[in-house]
């Protein structure tokens, strides 16, 4: 299990931001056109005429997490409830792009924390997952960034994050192994230090919730 680094220059919360100037839509479209030529296609044929525009717009959306910040996302939705038992949001669907091949990986994220009196709006946990997923990623870093973010905004007694995902770079190319899943975890505070707390979390994410009537 992985413990993220939580302070100083090692912080991952705001890491991996593009430092180059914004590339224009036209430049992105030209790059897609070059890619089409590179794979032996004709960008002028009817079915591909709008492909450069569509691909550029799709990648802007799929990487829109670069333009978001944790402060703006949370927007003050932190409440002093005096609660000190585990809060778990499980089965958060996540889609991201592998930074090595820019192919999708997708799966579920489970996020838990034990408050230190303060709680955050539940939807914010899902939005944190979404923000970091919409960047070029590796699953290990994505898992750590989610844990770091919850730790940063709440300073809770502990944070636990588990992600289960399937990677298209292992399915569509390379070893070509459909059905393979990668599981990563980040445990902070009591989840790392106390075995019973960690086991409670792992038991809860394995348990199937009751069906919604």
Swiss-Prot record:
GO terms for molecular function: GTP binding; GTP cyclohydrolase I activity; zinc ion binding. SUPFAM superfamilies: Tetrahydrobiopterin biosynthesis enzymes-like. GO terms for biological process: one-carbon metabolic process; tetrahydrobiopterin biosynthetic process; tetrahydrofolate biosynthetic process. GO terms for cellular component: cytoplasm. It catalyses: GTP + H2O = 7,8-dihydroneopterin 3'-triphosphate + formate + H(+). InterPro entries: GTP-CH-I_C/QueF, GTP-CH-I_N, GTP_CycHdrlase_I, GTP_CycHdrlase_I_CS, GTP_CycHdrlase_I_dom. Zn(2+) binds at residues 98, 101, 169. Pathway: Cofactor biosynthesis; 7,8-dihydroneopterin triphosphate biosynthesis; 7,8-dihydroneopterin triphosphate from GTP: step 1/1. Its EC number is 3.5.4.16. Keywords: GTP-binding, Hydrolase, Metal-binding, Nucleotide-binding, One-carbon metabolism, Zinc. Belongs to the GTP cyclohydrolase I family. This is GTP cyclohydrolase 1. It comes from Synechococcus elongatus (strain ATCC 33912 / PCC 7942 / FACHB-805) (Anacystis nidulans R2). The lineage of its organism: Bacteria, Bacillati, Cyanobacteriota, Cyanophyceae, Synechococcales.
């Amino acid at each position: 299990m992985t413990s993220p680094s939580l302070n100083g220059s090692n912080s991952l919360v705001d890491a991996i931001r593009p430092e180059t100037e914004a590339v224009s839509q036209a430049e992105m479209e030209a790059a897609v056109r070059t890619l089409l030529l590179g794979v032996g296609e004709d960008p002028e044929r009817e079915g591909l005429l709008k492909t450069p525009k569509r691909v550029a717009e799709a990648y802007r959306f799929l990487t829109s997490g670069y333009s978001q910040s944790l402060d703006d996302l949370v927007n003050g939705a932190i409440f002093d409830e005096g609660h000190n038992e585990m809060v778990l949001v499980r089965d958060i669907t996540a889609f991201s792009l592998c930074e090595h091949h820019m192919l999708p990986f997708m799966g579920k994220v489970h996020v838990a924390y034990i408050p230190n009196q303060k709680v955050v709006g539940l939807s914010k946990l899902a939005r944190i997952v979404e923000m970091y997923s919409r960047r070029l990623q590796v699953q290990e870093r994505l898992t750590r960034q989610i844990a770091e973010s919850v730790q940063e905004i709440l300073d809770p007694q502990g944070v636990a994050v588990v992600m289960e995902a399937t990677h298209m770079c292992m399915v569509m190319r390379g070893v070509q192994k459909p059905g393979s899943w990668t599981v990563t975890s980040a445990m902070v505070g009591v989840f790392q230090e106390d075995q019973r707390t960690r086991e409670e979390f792992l038991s809860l994410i394995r348990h199937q919730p009751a069906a919604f009537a």
